[in-house]
Every structure is written in structure tokens, then in C-alpha cells.
Amino acid sequence: MKRLVLILLALASLQCAFAATVREVILRDSTDRLMIPVDRNTMLDLYDYYDAGQHVYAKTPNKEEVEIDSITDNYICISTSRISLIQAWLAKAGSDSIVVVSTTYETKPRMSIVRAYNAQSFDDITDKVFTPLTLDDFIAKGTTKAKRAELKEKIPGLYVVYSINASTGEILASHHTYECFPKEDYDAIKPYLVEKRYLVLKGKKYRLAR
């Protein structure tokens, strides 16, 4: 308990230093709840608290409370186990950083809806950041039209999730395409998927390793 109090006091002293790029984060244990504004750098200071088995909560742009799943040097992954799975990756703090929120529905095939937000204002910038990809982007060249039609019928919708730094184009996280498919369908589709995939970002191509 003493350690928890010291951590909370230290975090409270940090909030003024990072007031320009704040995030609303909830620290919660079995007996108490404290809401403090922090940014990404402060988030990294929560590592000890996280590793101690405590739960750290944040709020998504649509005000849903989610538990932070992991904290790394490059991004913070937050998720919640509800009917839908919401994941967000925070780019490094800055005026042109983005938050990418993916909502994955447990349908067959699983479907992810993606929205991108400015990390500071939370303005929706999805159309400015992403060029949508379709199943055609992932089917290998040389696949016959008949086979393409068969694959599209089997997988009627496909959303691919990427998190990028809007200023550098650095890819912070991604869902592999085939994770959107039921396993039995993927086994049939796998031979027809391209080995390398490309993310089209504002007219530029970024190759993603398989």
C-alpha cells in the first residue's frame, strides 16, 4: 500500500509537466480509483505499477473504458474483452500523432472497422490517413478470374488494420490479414495470398513483411 501511495504521488507531480499532451487515465485497484491526466511518456512510467499486477485503465475517443494490455517503447496497446474487441495504438506524442481504433466483430469472417483520430484533438482523420485495401490487394497475380470470384464470395468483406505514425509513416502495429478469416477458410485461401503486402498511405507504399 505504501508503494502504491508513493507511485500515485509521483504521477501527480508529473501531470503538470505533460499538460500539453494529456490523456485521461484511470489507475484502479480493489479499493480505490484515481483519475489523472498523463501523456505517452508518463504512461511508460506506469510500467512498475503494471508489472506489480495492478490494472491500468484508459479511455478511448468514444469514452469507452479499456484496460491497457501492454506498454512498450513505441506504442501502447489497449484492449477490452467485450462482444467486440477494441484495440488502439498510440503514436508518439506530437501534434500530428494519430490514434487508430479497431473494432473487431466476432462474425464469420471476423470483421474489423477502423477509424483514425488526431491524438490531440481526436478529430476523425480516417480518410486523410488511410487508403482502403480490398481482397484484390492480397490475391496473388495469376489467379484466375473464376478463382478470384470464388475467394471474394467466400470472404465478402475485409478490413485491414494498421497503426502508423502520421508524420514518418512508421508502422507501429498491424493485424495480419489472414487473422480475419476462420481457420477452415484460411487453409483454402492461403495458397492464393501474396507473400508480401503493401500499405498505401497517402500515395506511398510501405511493404509489410508476412
Predicted segments, located by residue:
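Short, solvent-exposed loop/turn segments at conserved positions within beta-propeller repeat blades
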Residues: 59-61, 69-71, 108-110, 189-193
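Short, surface-exposed coil-to-beta transition loops
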Residues: 83-86, 99, 109-114, 155-159, ...
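Terminal domain-start segments
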Residues: 20-92
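Mid-length scaffold segments of soluble, non-membrane domains
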Residues: 98-130
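Sec/Tat signal peptide C-region and signal peptidase I cleavage site
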Residues: 14-19
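Short aromatic loop motif centered on NTY/YTY
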Residues: 125-203, 208-210
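Sec-dependent N-terminal signal peptides
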Residues: 4-13
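Short beta-strand elements that form the blades of beta-propeller/WD-repeat-like
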Residues: 96-106, 169-176
